[in-house]
A protein has these predicted regions:
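Bacterial N-terminal signal peptides
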Residues: 6-17
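Exposed aromatic-hydrophobic patches
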Residues: 41, 80-88
Length: 406
């Protein structure tokens, strides 16, 4: 039997055209509060005219409400038809799906407790990123860190900087990002302490220890920052560098050789206040204040957070907050991170926001008005620059504004 090419093509086209376009309904997977706006999105790869949609109770299969008010939206990606499905006026608690024709949404809940546990859920990522001991692996890593570099007198000396968090899917560690994460967690706990539970212990393993899990995570970060600032005027900015980027590996299997032997320790970059390596070039470090300010604000707020749980450590942190602040004041400028293989770094371009937040936080912790006055002055120096995730600008402005008018 012989078939013409044109016949085969026509047959394939007919077959493909008979396959219906993909359609989806996207919902808030956490669910919806009864009194809150409730919107889902219908999307289709083909042309679709949606005129109505229904809300179905999952356990009975009953249609509990019909809607005839879909709002057509712009196309999105390969989705040729997009509609917003508003069902805000339905407030009965329960478990439901939305249906458009034969297309069903995933099930979702309407109820007053849909957000319970979401604050703690975020901490799963922080525990996953832990260095020193990783509760997800239930194994230790990087226990030999590290060797000092860029110090005027201590290059190659050992320093104990275990702990903290890995920055991303690599295993580098930076004060730039870790201090930000620590402060953000403290700020969140300070504003809403009641939303955090106690399900894990201090090591991130299952089992309550009488301390909110977010405070356990905060202390994990503060312990590391404390090690990275072991004495007055001695600050370190990062552990390891992009020589780490040699394939995917679990933290416990990181055996990169930085010059001291495989897996025997990683470089710990001293805050020298001077340019350091950036691939074939040098970074644009001009001082220490951007890092010192981060230390100071974290230590000052950390003293407030930990005083009810670890009072001795809280006392130490408040002393170190003052020391870090004055070290930054005496060494103005930005302290950028370093890289060896490529030119990609955290390109810190501002330091006054860090010092402003540090001054405000020290004012809150000590009540000394001189710190508030200095915070206002740092705010006046603030350049108009783009907000980035590792800068404390928004927090420093907000806190300074809050206290300056009291």
């Amino acid at each position: 039997m012989k078939y013409s090419i044109s016949g085969i093509i026509i047959g394939l086209v007919s077959l493909l055209s008979s396959v219906s376009a993909g359609e989806w309904i996207r919902i808030n997977q956490l669910g919806y509060l009864p009194e809150s706006p409730k919107v889902a999105v219908f999307m289709s790869e083909g042309k679709a005219a949606v005129e109505e949609y229904v809300l179905v109770e999952v356990f009975t299969g009953e249609i509990v409400k019909w809607f005839d008010n879909p709002k057509k939206a712009n196309t999105w990606g390969r989705m040729q038809s997009v509609y917003r499905l508003d069902f805000s006026d339905f407030k009965t608690e329960g478990t439901y799906v939305l249906r458009v024709g034969e297309t069903m949404s995933p099930r979702f809940v309407i109820g007053n407790r849909v957000y319970d546990g979401t604050a703690d859920f975020i901490l799963r990522y922080m525990r996953q990123q832990r260095c020193g001991f990783n509760p997800f692996e239930r194994d230790s890593c990087h226990i030999h860190d590290g060797y000092i570099v860029y110090h005027p007198t201590r290059n190659g000396k050992r320093i104990d900087v275990r702990g903290g968090w890995h920055d991303a899917s690599d295993q580098l560690q930076y004060v730039t990002t870790s201090a930000n994460a620590t402060y953000q967690m403290m700020f969140a706990y300070l504003k809403n302490p009641e939303v955090y539970g106690d399900v894990y212990d201090a090591y991130g393993l299952p089992g309550a220890n009488g301390i909110p899990d977010i405070v356990d995570e905060i202390k994990w970060g503060l312990d590391w920052l404390n090690r990275m600032n072991p004495s007055k005027g001695e600050m370190y900015n990062q552990i390891a560098d992009d020589r780490d980027h040699k394939g995917f590996k679990l933290p416990s299997q990181d055996h990169i050789d930085y010059g001291w032997g495989k897996g025997t320790g990683r470089p710990v970059y001293y805050c020298s206040g001077k340019p350091q390596v950036r691939g074939e070039f040098s970074n644009a470090t001009t001082g220490v204040a951007s890092t010192a300010g981060k230390y100071a604000s974290c230590f000052a707020l950390g003293a407030e957070i930990l005083k009810d749980f670890y009072p001795d450590m809280a006392d130490i942190l408040l002393v170190k907050a003052r020391e870090a602040y004055w070290h930054g004041a005496n060494n103005p400028g930005v302290c950028q991170t370093a890289s060896v293989v490529s030119p990609y770094i955290y390109e810190e371009c501002n330091w006054t926001d860090d010092m402003e937040l540090a001054a405000v936080q020290l004012y809150v912790s000590t009540g000394e008005t001189s710190f508030l006055q200095e915070a206002v002055e740092y705010g006046r120096f603030e350049p108009v620059t783009m907000v980035s995730f590792y800068q404390f600008r928004a927090l420093s402005f907000g806190e300074c504004e809050r206290f300056a008018h009291k």
